[in-house]
């Protein structure tokens, strides 16, 4: 899948602890090699639609597992996964 890594994602990823940064690298590498369908079924990435979270233009947002507690927030535009932000607290990601 194509990736669009937004500055907000990069900034938030760089502010995280070393284990979360390592998880971000692993998640990005995995996502880059899978289709959307494969990501939706991948147990490690655990891509799921975030209920009630929409972008400003009304597109659904998704979460991806970075570590046991950290999640990446993303949206999908065509065949591109747009990475928006890294949230270190699982509960705050939703």
Show where each model-derived region lies:
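Basic, Lys/Arg-enriched alpha-helical interface segments
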Residues: 1-70, 76-94
